[in-house]
Amino acid sequence: MSYNRRSKNITQGVARSPNRSMYYALGYQKEDFDKPMIGIANGHSTITPCNAGLQRLSDAAVAAVKDAGANPQIFGTPTISDGMSMGTEGMKYSLVSREVIADCIETCVQGQWMDGVVVVGGCDKNMPGGMIALARINVPGIYVYGGTIRPGHWKGHDLTIVSSFEAVGEFTAGRMSQEDFEGVEKNACPTTGSCGGMYTANTMSSSFEALGMSLLYSSTMANPDQEKVDSAAESARVLVEAVKKDLKPRDIITKQSIENAVSVIMATGGSTNAVLHYLAIAHAAEIDWSIEDFERIRKRVPVICDLKPSGQYVATDLHAAGGIPQVMKLLLDAGLLHGDCMTITGRTLAEELKDVPSVPRADQKVIHPIDQALYKEGHLAILKGNLAEDGAVAKITGLKNPVITGPARVFDDEQSALAAILDDRIRAGDVVVLRYLGPQGGPGMPEMLAPTSAIIGKGLGESVGLITDGRFSGGTWGMVVGHVAPEAFVGGTIALVQEGDSITIDAHKLLLQLNVDDAELARRRAAWKQPAPRYTRGVLAKYAALARPANQGAVTG
């Protein structure tokens, strides 16, 4: 039986003789035209450690596709480094790159009539970009995560990239020596691989195991390890079998499997960015999913993993403790996962987890039993109020001060806010407002890791609030609220905040409130004028023109 269901459109028949001529130039033989064409979307790049170790994974996938009797077709996907662009204008391209990656994969797979695709990625937006593409085109596909970085070490302390961001605030506050500052800087990132805590890259890749679109254990492997290469090869073999079975992403990505993915995100203390990305993935798969669904799952799924940024451990520790399968087995036994969801292997999630122990190992402290959860409810909460009528997102677990009411310190760009923090112009009790940074206004919802880390480094993490219509890095923690919708650029209430206004952030009531009377707000609204777009040409201008609100995933189509 032939499995080239799609590629036959470009290789078969008399009229396709010129097409075959070009394939012959690539080394194809006549018998190859009856084999399926498998794309390898290779995100390898030397601009970031997150992607610098992907080539050997892609090479392993190519070899495995050949061994499985199919034709590998390699094409590239772009990336930017969130960590390197953080705190600069370059960060505005981060979320935009999610859309660009999705469009690149769609363009190559559809334009070349590929029968399946192995997506290999590393940095934060590689994962949602790839999964959006797979859900959109609905061609058999699998996601191969590049793997996590190993933790750095300095004077007996484990380090991640967030350690370096927080060191900026500590150093400028006089709380860290020059030696330690440089020691953290030089040792925070010791290997290739994505940032090591349960930040955005590890959050999304972990959730893909639960979604059913990545192999078990693959998300917590370290990039430098041989098992990561072996997993990439096995993923490619599984994908070829999925092509033979005609098992497509939308057979796997369902509302129930997204619930599984989000449940794992809650259980592991994952990134706020997951809210934005799963809204986008669901949209691509044409699944009814809203921010209210996150709140529904938060209320029933506890946090059972002690992982950075708010906890102690990193992804390699989680891997040693049993990985995401161990987390999923605990959730499944507690009735918190849909075990009948299909996975890319052709087996159900429950079948995949059959041999995983029901009790986590006693010699580890990363994964807690359900009855010993760190928090009884999930950490990613949807806040609403007159400052966020369409919702905002916050991490609410572990806060020493879950309610803050304080004067607004208003900034219309990130750099001004960061300067104020580093210059000690932000005081305990203040609520920093960073606005005109939403999908349209930023554009691109840049992440605010630099200012939030500076606040923590200054020792103000428990006493200063920060709200924004932009985003936060997965490495952010503290009294911070992002994804405020409607955003300032379209006239959301956040645009009407004035310096010194009283603002309340209440994690108990899930409230984000500007304490100004309605008459005054109406007066301000009547006087407000939309600012001119920051960009009028190029990809940022295109994104700003097309982007939907944050509560709809900030998608472009």
From Swiss-Prot:
It comes from the Bacteria. Transmembrane segments: none annotated. The modification N6-carboxylysine is found at K125. Keywords: 2Fe-2S, Amino-acid biosynthesis, Branched-chain amino acid biosynthesis, Iron, Iron-sulfur, Lyase, Magnesium, Metal-binding. It holds the Pfam family ILV_EDD_C. The keyword Translocase does not apply. GO terms for biological process: isoleucine biosynthetic process; L-valine biosynthetic process. The active site is at S473 (proton acceptor). GO terms for molecular function: 2 iron, 2 sulfur cluster binding; dihydroxy-acid dehydratase activity; magnesium ion binding. PANTHER family: DIHYDROXY-ACID DEHYDRATASE DAD, DIHYDROXY-ACID DEHYDRATASE, MITOCHONDRIAL. Functions in the biosynthesis of branched-chain amino acids. Catalyzes the dehydration of (2R,3R)-2,3-dihydroxy-3-methylpentanoate (2,3-dihydroxy-3-methylvalerate) into 2-oxo-3-methylpentanoate (2-oxo-3-methylvalerate) and of (2R)-2,3-dihydroxy-3-methylbutanoate (2,3-dihydroxyisovalerate) into 2-oxo-3-methylbutanoate (2-oxoisovalerate), the penultimate precursor to L-isoleucine and L-valine, respectively. Homodimer. This is Dihydroxy-acid dehydratase. It comes from Burkholderia mallei (strain ATCC 23344). The lineage of its organism: Bacteria, Pseudomonadati, Pseudomonadota, Betaproteobacteria, Burkholderiales. The gene is ilvD.
